[in-house]
């Protein structure tokens, strides 16, 4: 299945400034889904939660547990909104391309935003930048910069390289898992459309892979949030 992303090249007349319309559209859809879901889940709150309120409270406690596993709650509670936003956004982004793919005139429109390395690396870069921001804000510039030459100044180049490797691994791990899943799903869809025998031959593997992809999508959203809090704790906690 040879499909390309709908890309607008050289926007505003700037060479190399390209815009992937599929990523833009799917990111907007994912954000809209997350926003509507969270508003729906937080309306008419009751002392005895039921239905979607139960799930929302479980999600809050789940993310809170991730934070407390990496830093004390007094320091980490300000990261609860960040963790919730990330886990919902990444989960929906991972799963939205599982059900189907949308192709219009050989352009791939409907897909998981996290199946694009540009999107995941941009997200990981933003997260690493946030860790530096909160490290300076909560510890002070002088104390924060000292961490790069601790315990000895020789550690400075290694810690600089570590920042780049953390950014790459955080983004590429998410991209690789979701992209591989969508590629295999696309191959199965292609097999199913070749003939009636191909349809029955691919139907069961396709259903099994879609189920497995839901599991992978959930695991990867957890891993991303967990690593975010690990990196954050390294910057804001004095015991790291």
UniProtKB/Swiss-Prot annotation:
Protein localization: Cell membrane
Predominant location category: membrane
Pfam families given in the database record:
ATP-synt_A
Example GO biological process: proton motive force-driven plasma membrane ATP synthesis
SUPFAM superfamilies reported for this sequence? F1F0 ATP synthase subunit A
Transmembrane intervals: 21-41, 78-98, 116-136, 183-203, 212-232
Q: Does the keyword Transmembrane helix apply?
A: yes
Domain of life of the organism encoding this protein: Bacteria
S-S pairs = none
Gene Ontology MF terms: proton-transporting ATP synthase activity, rotational mechanism
**This protein's GO CC annotations:** plasma membrane; proton-transporting ATP synthase complex
Alphabetized, the UniProt keywords read:
ATP synthesis, Cell membrane, CF(0), Hydrogen ion transport, Ion transport, Membrane, Transmembrane, Transmembrane helix, Transport
| Membrane topology, record value | Multi-pass membrane protein
Q: Which PROSITE patterns match?
A: ATPASE_A (PS00449)
CDD domains xrefs: ATP-synt_Fo_a_6
Family (UniProt): Belongs to the ATPase A chain family.
> What NCBIfam families does this protein's entry cite?
ATP_synt_6_or_A (TIGR01131), PRK05815.1-4 (NF004479)
Its biological purpose is as follows:
Key component of the proton channel; it plays a direct role in the translocation of protons across the membrane.
Q: What binding partners and quaternary form does the record give?
A: F-type ATPases have 2 components, CF(1) - the catalytic core - and CF(0) - the membrane proton channel. CF(1) has five subunits: alpha(3), beta(3), gamma(1), delta(1), epsilon(1). CF(0) has three main subunits: a(1), b(2) and c(9-12). The alpha and beta chains form an alternating ring which encloses part of the gamma chain. CF(1) is attached to CF(0) by a central stalk formed by the gamma and epsilon chains, while a peripheral stalk is formed by the delta and b chains.
Q: Which protein is depicted? A: ATP synthase subunit a
Give the gene that encodes this protein: atpB
